[in-house]
Amino acid sequence: MKVAVIGAGLAGSEAAYKIAQAGYKVDLYEMRPEKQTPAHKTPYFAEIVCSNSFGSESLTSGAGLLKKEMEVLGSIILDVAKEFKVPAGQAFAVDREKFSKKLTEILENHPNINVIRQEVKTLPDADIIVIATGPLTSEEFSKEIQKITGSEYLYFYDAIAPVVDASTVDFSKGFWADRYGKGTGDYFNCVLSEQEYEIFYQELLKGEQVPLKDFERAVYFEGCLPIEEIARRGKETLLYGPMKPVGLIDPKTGKRPYAVVQLRKENIEGTLLSLVGFQTKLKYPEQKRIFSLIPALKDAEFVKLGSIHRNTFIQSQKLLKPTLQLRKKPNILFAGQITGVEGYMASAATGIIAGINVARMLEGKEPVVPPKTTMIGGLINYITTAKNELQPMGPNYALLPELEEKIKGKEERKLKKAEIALKDIKEWTKEIESAVFI
C-alpha cells in the first residue's frame, strides 16, 4: 500500500518517521524551498518559526507532561531537540537551525522515507494520506482541503478569546443564565458595576498590543474585531457588544447588571470556560492584568490567552474521529496545527498518533485512541468533541479528568494527574503492541 505524508513540519516529520520505523515506505512531501511561506526562511523540516522554546519541562505544566508522554511514545523531534538544547531555565529551548538541519538529515537519509520537494495542489495517488500542512497551508492546497472537508469547516484566521480554568473562577461574583431566560443557563455572567466597568474600559484602552504581521493584515476585514478595537469606538460600544447586559437579571439584586462578561463552556466537562467575544491582540501580560480586573476573574488562571492571527485549521469536532481519521474518508488522517491543536509539542504529538495509526492500518489492525487521562488523549478528545466552534488549544491540565480523590493544593493535584497520565500512557503503549514500538 502506498502512503503519503503532506507537510514536513513537526507533525509530518513525526508521522513519517513513525511509519518508516515500523518498516513501511512513505512519501514525505514538502513544498519548501520551492515555495516558501510568509513565515519560513529555510529549506529544513520542522523549522521553528516563532519562539525557540518547546515550553516548560516542569511536570506541573501541561507542556511538561506532554513531553514526558511523547518520550514514552518515542519522539524523533524530542530526541533531536535534546542534542541541541540551549540553557533557558525551566524551559526546553533549542538551537533552532541546528535542530531542524539535523532532523532533515535523519529523515532524508532514512531508507523508508522518500522526500518529494514540491507543492501538493491535489491529493497524491496514495492509499493512506496524512495531511500535516500546518497553519500556513498554501492557497492551492487549502482549496483541495475545502473540497475534502467542506468549505465551511476550514478556517483561515484564529480569533481566539482567552480561556480560564473553571476551578479558579469566583462564581460568587456573577450568575449562570441565558439571555431572556432562554436555554438551560449555559453562560456564566461575570457582573461589573459602573465603576468596575469604567476602570476596566480605561485600562483596556491603555493596553499594549501585539503588532500585526504583514500577512495578517486582512484579518480585521473578516468581521472579527479585537475587543480593544471595539472599545476605541466609544465608551459605551462594549455595552452594546460583548459586554451587553440586555436580557439578564442578576438574581442577587433583581436588576439588570451594568455590564457583564459571559463565560461559556469550552469542553463537555465544563472545566474550561472562554470569555465570549473577547478575541484580542493585547500582549499576554496585559491580558492577564486587564482581564483580572473583572471581579469574578480576579484570581483566575488563564490556560489560554487571546489572539488574532493567520492560522489554517479545520473544525475537527465535525470532521475527525478521535483516531485523527476523516470520518467520511478514513484513509485520510490529519495531524498538527491544522487539526486545532496549538503549539510545537501538541502538533508533534498528534503526528506521533497519526503515524502510529497509519502503521496499525498497514498492519491490518484497528487505529487507536490514547487514554483521556493523558495529555495527548486530552488534547485529541478536546479537538474532536469541542462543544462550539473549535478554537485552537494547547496542553493544559484542565483538559484532563477531575481526580476521584480530593487533594489539597493546585500543584499537588497537577502532579497526581501527571502520575496517572504517565502510568496510563505506558500501559497503553504496551497494550497496542505495534511495530512502531519495536
Swiss-Prot record:
EC number of the protein: 2.1.1.74
GO biological process, one term: tRNA wobble uridine modification
Keywords: Cytoplasm, FAD, Flavoprotein, Methyltransferase, NAD, NADP, Transferase, tRNA processing
Catalytic reactions on record: uridine(54) in tRNA + (6R)-5,10-methylene-5,6,7,8-tetrahydrofolate + NADH + H(+) = 5-methyluridine(54) in tRNA + (6S)-5,6,7,8-tetrahydrofolate + NAD(+); uridine(54) in tRNA + (6R)-5,10-methylene-5,6,7,8-tetrahydrofolate + NADPH + H(+) = 5-methyluridine(54) in tRNA + (6S)-5,6,7,8-tetrahydrofolate + NADP(+)
Compartmental location: Cytoplasm
Pfam families in the cross-refs: GIDA
Record keyword Ligase present: no
Chain residues that bind FAD: 7-12
Keyword Lipid biosynthesis: no
Cofactor(s) in the UniProt record: FAD
Main location: cytoplasm
EC top class named in words: transferase
GO molecular function: flavin adenine dinucleotide binding; tRNA (uracil(54)-C5)-methyltransferase activity, 5,10-methylenetetrahydrofolate-dependent
GO cellular component: cytosol
Signal peptide: none
Family: Belongs to the MnmG family. TrmFO subfamily.
Functional summary from the UniProt entry: Catalyzes the folate-dependent formation of 5-methyl-uridine at position 54 (M-5-U54) in all tRNAs.
Protein name per UniProt: Methylenetetrahydrofolate--tRNA-(uracil-5-)-methyltransferase TrmFO
Native species: Sulfurihydrogenibium sp. (strain YO3AOP1)
Taxonomic placement: Bacteria, Pseudomonadati, Aquificota, Aquificia, Aquificales
Gene assigned in the entry: trmFO
